[in-house]
Amino acid sequence: MSTESIVIAIGTYSQEESLHQGGIFSYEIDFDLKSANLLAETKIPSEAGYLVFNSKNRILYAVDERRAIGPNTNSSEVSVYSLKYENNKFVNQSSIKTFGANPTFLALDVDRNLLFSANHGGLGVHAQKITGNFESGWKTEFIFDDSSVVTYKLSPEGDLIEVSDVKVLTGNGIVPNKSPQVAGFAQTGPHAHCAVLSPGGKFVLVADKGTDQLIVYEAGEILKEINSLKFPDVTGPRHLVFSETGELIYLTLEFSSEVATLIFDNKTGNLQLINRISTVSPTFKELNEPAEIRIHRTNKFLYVNNRGEDSIAWFHIDEDGLPTRKGDFKLAKSIHPGLAARSFVITPDGKHLIFADRPANLIRVFSIDINDGSLLEIFVFNVLNPAYVEILEGKE
């Protein structure tokens, strides 16, 4: 591997029209040669929507982002894969079911040998039941998927051992609401979209876009809720990152198309909302739903991808920790916010950003201007239905 290269894993979704089966693919990216060399692949999981690299044990965790439609159908799982490839194939070491549909996020606690998953659950009605009788009257009952946060115990080698805790979230938002997701019924129940370990590993923070809450748990084999912050109705907290010191949180609000800035007390878990700004250009007036958010290693720049405006926007962070939007790069047009580009990573040295542009079936590789945070696309390569990008190794 050259000094200007990096190895990444790309999780993909299955795609009926192209017969693409989904799976995970690893590539060596050479920034000087502007090339991508396929190293290994696996067709399972078919819905590899989130990946986490365990550098200590050189293994990769992946979700299978699906929901079972019956007791005899495949349910969602978390799996671990060895990076000691055999015949250019990932090797599955272990898998375990998630107690919750559509796992969308993983967080690794190496010190405690724990893994956390946020399980979003499906959107819309799962089942419509008829209850009652002739005497009492007939009624219609609607049953929705549960959303959960699951804790998995790991072996010292990183293998999945067992589930140690399941937190089933409760509540709902305004139904129907002004969001066009599921015709205004996207908040019929909770929807955990991320579970992020705080700097130092004391807390796990869960963004619940179904109830407009950010929940703080004390980390451990059994999660203990210690705090929560309710956001304004129909804002939809989604993903978050911490500042370098851990004193500030930057959080995407999916329904209101904003980035929120919060003060975080890493000793007590207390939260304070101090700022909200739009993620899109002032001239853009259509529907937009931001997804991923990343912070540059210099702590000077934030990056957010927009689904609707179809852009990756960069923000400058001032001395008070507040972001201001400075520019954007236009991406392929999304089919709809649920079928759009939504994942990217910044290389450890802060020089490059690698983006999964799902509607275009492309991985876009950018250089980052360390003076103003702006992006310059340097090359692209084809990957069918890319959903997530994770860095496996590279220069810092």
Regions found by a protein language model. Give the residues of each.
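Short loop/turn segments immediately following beta-strands, especially the blade-tip
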Residues: 27-34, 81-88, 141, 151-162, ...
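Short glycine/acidic-enriched loop and turn motifs that connect beta-strands
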Residues: 14-18, 66-71, 121-126, 211-213, ...
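Blade-loop segments of beta-propeller domains
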Residues: 37-112
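Beta-rich, blade/repeat-based domains predominating
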Residues: 46-56, 99-110, 130, 136-143, ...
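Beta-propeller fold detector
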Residues: 36-43, 90-97, 161-178, 224-229, ...
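Structural preference for solvent-exposed beta-strand-turn elements
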Residues: 8-9, 14, 105-215, 309
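An edge-strand/N-cap motif at the start of beta-rich repeat modules
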Residues: 1-32
